[in-house]
Structure formats: C-alpha cells, structure tokens
Amino acid sequence: MVNFTVDQIRAIMDKKANIRNMSVIAHVDHGKSTLTDSLVCKAGIIASARAGETRFTDTRKDEQERCITIKSTAISLFYELSENDLAFIKQSKDGSGFLINLIDSPGHVDFSSEVTAALRVTDGALVVVDCVSGVCVQTETVLRQAIAERIKPVLMMNKMDRALLELQLDPEELYQTFQRIVENVNVIISTYGEGESGPMGNIMIDPVLGTVGFGSGLHGWAFTLKQFAEMYVAKFAAKGDAQMNPTERAKKVEDMMKKLWGDRYFDPATGKFSKSATGPDGKKLPRTFCQLILDPIFKVFDAIMTFKKEEAAKLIEKLDIKLDSEDKDKEGKPLLKAVMRRWLPAGDALLQMITIHLPSPVTAQKYRCELLYEGPPDDEAAIGIKNCDPRGSLMMYISKMVPTSDKGRFYAFGRVFSGLVSTGLKVRIMGPNYTPGKKEDLYLKPIQRTILMMGRYVEPIEDVPCGNIVGLVGVDQFLVKTGTITTFEHAHNMRVMKFSVSPVVRVAVEAKNPADLPKLVEGLKRLAKSDPMVQCIIEESGEHIIAGAGELHLEICLKDLEEDHACIPIKKSDPVVSYRETVSEESNVMCLSKSPNKHNRLYMKARPFPDGLAEDIDKGEVSARQELKQRARYLAEKYEWDVTEARKIWCFGPDGTGPNILTDITKGVQYLNEIKDSVVAGFQWATKEGVLCEENMRGVRFDVHDVTLHADAIHRGGGQIIPTARRCLYACVLTAQPRLMEPIYLVEIQCPEQVVGGIYGVLNRKRGHVFEESQVAGTPMFVVKAYLPVNESFGFTADLRSNTGGQAFPQCVFDHWQILPGDPFDSASRPSQVVAETRKRKGLKEGIPALDNFLDKL
C-alpha cells in the first residue's frame, strides 16, 4: 500500500462509517511511538525494513535526540479487513477499506496540553501500558481526560518481551499482572466515566471482548484474544464447518474468546474446557490463557533464546510460520524478532482492534456533540455535528497550530465535524472569545489551501468532508491557538479545551541585544501560537514572562523561541513560581469604603471557601454558565451554603470563571442593580491582582452586606463605584487573615527497593512529604508517591538521580494549591519573604499596603 495517491485517500474520506480517528496515549516511555511504527509500517508509509527504529512520528530533531515525543503528530493509515473480520464490527460500515487517522501524542506530563489537543479531534484512544511497570500517574491523567471528552479506550499491554526475558515471570504470574492492569484501568474508567447507562454504553475494557492487546512494540508482535481464538476455532473445527459464513464464524470465535480469559481451565488430556481448577482425577488444571496462549509463546521464546535449533525449527513448522531465506540463518534475539513478527504481526492485531472496537465519526459524534458544541442542541450546527452530515454547514474545530517549514507561518490543525471544507471557501473564523451576534474575535476570510498531514510530509488536497482531520493554510493570522471555523451564521463556538495541568512555572526573558526587542516580541507571539499550553505575558514593568507547566516544558519552549521563533540570543531569569492569595478566616470587622465623591458607601466582608469548592470550580462542576437553581442546590447540599445566598451569586472571578465568588446578601437596597456591573468590574480587577503582591486570588468569597447610594444617577457612575469596590475588597482581605498559597506537585518515583532511603532524604530537604509507597507486584520496583512544592522542584530530578545512583525516575504533575504556613505580616516568616521578593520583581512599593488606605471611617 505504498503508492497512496491523494485521490485514493479522498475517495475513502467520503465513507464516513469507515473512518477511525484515534490517538495513542500513555505514560512517558511506555513505547507509544515505537508501537505507532508497527501500525504505520503495516499501513504502508515507511518501508517495513526500517520499522521499530524510525519512530516515524517523532518529527522534530530534539525529539529524536531525547527519545521523547514532544508534539503530537498526525498520520493517515489505510487498512483492509477481510470478509471474516468485517463480521465482528457492531456499528454501521461501508466497504472493507478503513481510513485510520492516527495521532501519536506525548506521554511526558509537561506536554499533557498537547495530549488534550490531540484528544479533542479523535473519537477513540489506544492506551498503552508497560506491563512491567503497570498503570502510572500519567496514564491515569491522560485516561481521565479521554473519558471526560467521551473517547472510547482500548488497551495495549506493551513490552511483553521485557516481562519474559528480564523478569522471567512464569505464565500464571504474567496472567495475574495482566489481570491487575486491566482491573486498574477499569477502576479509572468507572470512576470518571458515566456508567453503562450513559450515552456511550459500557466502555470498560475486557480481553474477552477483544479490547485488550498484548505484545511488544520493539519486536513488532502483538495479539488480542481474537487471533488465538481464530487459530483454535480452525483447529477444533469439525470437517463440515469449513464452509461457515463469516457471521457464524464470528459467533464461534466470540464464544471461544470467552473461554480464553478469567477463571476458565483447560484439560489437555481430554481437550475439554472446564470452569473448575481441578480435573476429574484431582490434578490441578492449567488456566486456559496460560495453556493455550502464553504457553506457545513461552515455548518459542525458550527454544530460540536457549539456542535449541531442532526444537525451534519444529515449532516454527508447527505454527506454520514462513520465514524469509535471510531470516533462517539468524539466531537468538534477531531470530526471535523475525519469528514473532511473522506469527503475530503487531500491525494486524492492533489495526483489527482499532477498526472493530473504536467508533467511527458517525457513531461518536452522536454522543460527543453535547460536549463539543456550546450552542443550543437543536440548531443547524448541532444537528450537522450529530449526524456528521457532509451536506450540512461547515463546523470545524482547530485544536492547535503546527509550524511550517516557512518561518513564522502555521498550519491550523483540526477536525471537520460537519460539512465540507475546501480550498478557497469563504468562512467565519471564530476565536475562543467570540460570542454570537458580536463582531469581536471574528474574521470572514477565505481558506487558502487545505492539506493532509502525513507525519513528516504534507500533501495538498482539494476538499475534505466531515469526520476527517485536516490542516488549513492561511488561517493562522486570525487565531491564536484554537478556534472554530464555520459557514453557519448563527453558529456558537466549539467548547474550549480544559487542560489538566496549569502553567505555574514562569521565567522572564529578554533579548541579549536591546536592538532585537521587536524580534523577541514577534517570537513570543509565535511561541504562544505553537504550544497550546504556554502563556506569554507582558508585565506592567515591561518584563516579558513565559509561563509553562514545568521545567522541561519551559526548557523546550525557550529553545523553540531562541531557534525557531525569534532567532536571536536570549537571556532568561531563574524560574519563578506563581502564587495565589487567599484568606484563612472571616473578616473581623465590617469593611466600609466610600466613593471618591463621598456620596456612596459599600459594606462587605470576606471569608474562605469550604474545602473542595475551589477545585470544583476549576473542574467546571460549579460554573457561571450553570442553571441558577441547580447550582444553588449543589452548593447547599455539598457545602451547606444558605440556599437564598447561593442563588444570589453575582459572579466568579478573575476572568468570570475563576475560583472566587461575589455574593449579594443585602436586603432591600435601592438602585442595587444599577451598580452591579461596576462592583463586578471592581471584583474582577481585585481578584486578578490581589492586595499582597498582585497575584490572583483563590478560594475567597466576598459578601456585599449593605450599600448606600446617592439618589442621583450621575453621582454613582462606574468611575465612582469601581475603585471603591476594589478598595473595599482589599480591606476585606486584609482584615480576614490573608495567606499565600503555593502550587504543589504530585511526584511519582519508580525505583529499586535499596534506594528508597535516598529518596526520603531528598524529599525532606525540599519540604516534600511521602504519602504512599507500594511495591509493584511481581517486580523488585517500588513506587513512592509524594507531594513536593513546585518552588522546590527546580533541579529536583538531578538531585534525586545523584542521590540514588541514577536509579530513580520521577514524574511531576501539578496537583493542588496549598496554603504556605506563616503570616505574611510577620517579617520573619517565609510568606513575607515571598511577598517582598514578588513585589520587588514586579516593581511595586515595598511592604504590603496598610489597611488605612482601603478602610474608611463612617
């Protein structure tokens, strides 16, 4: 299938029931890119000889040097199912050729924003788990995101070669390892999923259904229970069964698959399956999975790796494996690779699992539409998305920008959800801040070219129908990172993606040569486009700040900035951590502020949130868009708020969505609604720049108790009320025991038992604490989980490696915000140092402003 012309691809694109959009997700170094190679090599875009070494989807030079995936890349594959295999597909189909759009995404947690962007445009996910180290923290994070986006998972147990050759597990232990991983994954799915009654039905993975693959990406072999069930159905078949039609055959194979997993046993003497572990004569029976599936694999491994030539030759003949002449002379690992590749090719097993079990756009968009589209569920756009209708109006989501070879220009990368996108089509380009009916963040422009993304290559194509993934040229000037492209006039936006990590580490950058400043600014603009997560901010003091998810993320952003985007030498400051400001108890006095003309008074108090509410707002469980009464009920039940107060939430802040709340608990105040907008504006301003050191506030609830206003409207305009509201809010915070919050990482460290002591030493020096330690069953590895302040995490990896002889591998994920102990007003405490440093860096007056500046006397 090498001669893939664009016309051939275009023809399959119309068969939307035969398209699969899927991403490959996993923990770092569990072998995603290597597995992707087997798929690409099977579907024919790399020469098969080079598969396994090419890592085709790692397109950047630094990715190949560091052996990690940094950006997600897209490739289209084509796979044909045989008549027999088509019978397994439970959804609608259209012919036997399948177009698979595969996105390989990074596993490293600092790039999880790339993963989010990849998930948005796909409907299914291949979750790769290293069967030696099991389900890790990043697997869980990514899987949780996938389920939140309603993406159906299938599982692949990778690195079986390690389990056999390094750990020398016996079949029963290996079965238990697999069983445990399947259980762990299902626990995550059932915790975050919607259950069987949800719109997707049951999405738990189960080897019996064929949604779990086993194998080794590096050696290029893999199987699901389906492959073995087919072998045994053929073997046990009676003579008359040879003429079975595909549907009957599929039914037989499915019955066989049920017998190959779980507590089912096989009696080799009689050739019968049984449900009890002991045979009729009382001897222990082997488990079917071990006897019928693992045993042949173990035999092949054993014969070849211990150089038993005759036995190996016999096995190869018995399993009916045809080797090339050049492979026959090999021995040891190379021969093992060749044999296993021939017998259980990874490409076939995985591509069959993908085509049979992952949903097509037709199936998936029915239940994903309500999550994807912000507008009413019955307008033209929503119906087009639900039905995946190529004749509907165009709705397309751009999930990220991909840099082109031409410096400074980007392809917009995204997926068509309804309609048809074509070269030269005039479209509405809507940024994330667009609201229907307004002009801002909206551009009417033609699309210059539509292109196909092929890993390292780009192919121009005339037009692309819905259900497909595509790149656009000429849209990049109008969008920053993401956006919606449509031809329907009253369309709403596609929902903005939620990132699982937040940018908490920031560095200031400046050009070494001041004359290069314009280039730096231009470079920052491009950097903000090319990475979905990074934030580029210009401080009021004129500093240029880059905020990222962690050290590695920032390092790569800075490298990109220096080499690709700005192309100038750059000086950078030490990394700085963002803090949040909060309060720890209720204001001890009622705070009053008067407006500049002394005619209006505001009375307010502040108090801290109950535990968990700020996190609920971050997750979107409680939000400004919710229906009023429903939100009030939730707050009353879960957090014991007063229902009438909960109904009178004026707004959330900063930015209208943040984790602070302004409630109105006044009784019978005249003209209150006229100043509502002004007070809200003051609140947004105050929560964005807190009183301690102008950082965002978090977890503060402000109550408006009473307002006295001037009767004449001209004396209570915005100019009078906004600064007053801000002063009053600051006074509330200062009287309510203000505190600083710092971000905390969850660190997961894998290491051998003997170096655990060294880890504790490093963590204690860095204010970290261990909250869980467990042994990975069946291996000598320990997993230590700890909380570590982000502030202390710089150089943590290097420190850890030097203290454990390089045997510990940490993974840091942003987990939560925690109050920094100590009072910022006490000059000896840690928070007061942080406040002083931050104020100095931002060029503010020294010392926290005194309460008298904000609090007025009656």
UniProtKB/Swiss-Prot annotation:
> Is the rRNA-binding keyword given for this protein?
no
Q: What is its main location?
A: cytoplasm
Q: Which residues form the tr-type G domain?
A: 17-362
Q: What class of enzyme is it?
A: hydrolase
Q: Which residues carry this modification: Phosphothreonine?
A: T57, T59
Top-rank taxon of the source lineage equals: Eukaryota
Please give one Gene Ontology molecular function term for this protein: translation elongation factor activity
Q: Which reaction does it catalyse?
A: GTP + H2O = GDP + phosphate + H(+)
- A single BP term in Gene Ontology: translational elongation
Task: Using the record's annotations, give every residue carrying the modification Diphthamide.
Answer: H715
Q: Which GO terms describe its cellular component?
A: cytoplasm; cytosol; nucleus; ribonucleoprotein complex
Q: What is its EC number?
A: 3.6.5.-
Q: What does this protein do?
A: Catalyzes the GTP-dependent ribosomal translocation step during translation elongation. During this step, the ribosome changes from the pre-translocational (PRE) to the post-translocational (POST) state as the newly formed A-site-bound peptidyl-tRNA and P-site-bound deacylated tRNA move to the P and E sites, respectively. Catalyzes the coordinated movement of the two tRNA molecules, the mRNA and conformational changes in the ribosome.
Assembly description: Binds to 80S ribosomes. Actively translating ribosomes show mutually exclusive binding of eIF5a (EIF5A or EIF5A2) and EEF2/eEF2. Interacts with SERBP1; interaction sequesters EEF2/eEF2 at the A-site of the ribosome, thereby blocking the interaction sites of the mRNA-tRNA complex, promoting ribosome stabilization and hibernation. Interacts with HABP4; interaction takes place at the A-site of hibernating ribosomes and promotes ribosome stabilization.
Q: Can you name this protein?
A: Elongation factor 2
Which species is the source of this protein? Gallus gallus (Chicken)
